[in-house]
């Protein structure tokens, strides 16, 4: 199976300057910053300390039906966890590997602008990279950033509304990331 740029599914390559796909790459990687900003908490909030305390593992999956307050719970946890947290509000538009990982990197850069630099250089290189290689480089960026002077030793990442993601390449690359998740990253998927 081939992507629209002619590469096999699961591979990313930066388009050449003459490639008409360059415009679609720009459209795919540009996104409103509201996607990486957590929603405001309601004024009248029922605190759920017992639930927020359960979000303590390196990776936490929150599963509940729509309307049960997952987003509010994660936002409450974010405000009280004591570390900077990047936020991704996913929707059906993010169900493409390039768009998904671009959004994740943009969110992480709200916490630390140096995160994702290797990823960006791979994206714009002339040779295609597998999603696995890109995810490994993102992991390495997070580890290097946490070792830098004055760096946050731990950061969080919330992937909210992950149920919109159906693309097998995203699931596979996220699984690869989970296998190599840096100890300084706390990932919450809802």
What are these regions (language model features)?
Residues 2-25:
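Interdomain "pre-motor" coupling segment immediately N-terminal to P-loop NTPase/helicase cores
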Residues 12, 66-68, 72-155, 164-166:
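Conserved phosphate-binding/catalytic loops and adjacent sensor/switch elements of nucleotide-binding enzymes
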Residues 17-54, 117-123:
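Conserved adenine-nucleotide phosphate-binding loops and their immediately adjacent elements
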Residues 52, 139, 171-175:
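A short, noncatalytic alpha-helical element within ATPase nucleotide-binding/catalytic domains
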Residues 59, 164-169, 175-190:
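Sensor-1/coupling segment of RecA-like P-loop NTPase cores
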Residues 62:
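Hydrophobic anchor at the beta1->P-loop junction of P-loop NTPases
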Residues 87, 157, 187-189:
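Structural beta-sheet core signal
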Residues 160-161:
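Walker B catalytic acidic pair
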């Amino acid at each position: 199976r081939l992507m629209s740029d002619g590469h096999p599914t699961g591979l990313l390559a930066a388009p050449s300057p003459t490639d008409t796909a360059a415009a679609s790459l720009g459209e795919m990687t540009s996104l409103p910053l509201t996607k990486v900003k957590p929603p405001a908490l309601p004024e009248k909030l029922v605190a759920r300390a017992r639930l927020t305390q359960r979000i303590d593992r390196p990776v936490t999956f929150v599963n509940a039906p729509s309307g049960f307050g997952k987003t509010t719970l994660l936002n409450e946890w974010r405000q009280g966890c004591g570390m900077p947290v990047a936020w991704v509000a996913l929707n059906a538009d993010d169900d493409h590997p390039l768009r998904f990982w671009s959004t994740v990197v943009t969110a992480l850069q709200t916490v630390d602008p140096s995160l994702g630099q290797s990823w960006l250089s791979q994206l714009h290189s002339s040779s295609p990279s597998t999603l696995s290689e890109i995810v490994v480089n993102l992991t390495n960026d997070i580890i290097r950033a946490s070792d830098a002077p004055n760096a946050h030793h731990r950061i969080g990442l919330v992937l909210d509304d992950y149920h919109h993601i159906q693309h097998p390449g995203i699931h596979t690359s996220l699984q690869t990331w989970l296998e190599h998740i840096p100890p300084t990253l706390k990932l919450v998927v809802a």
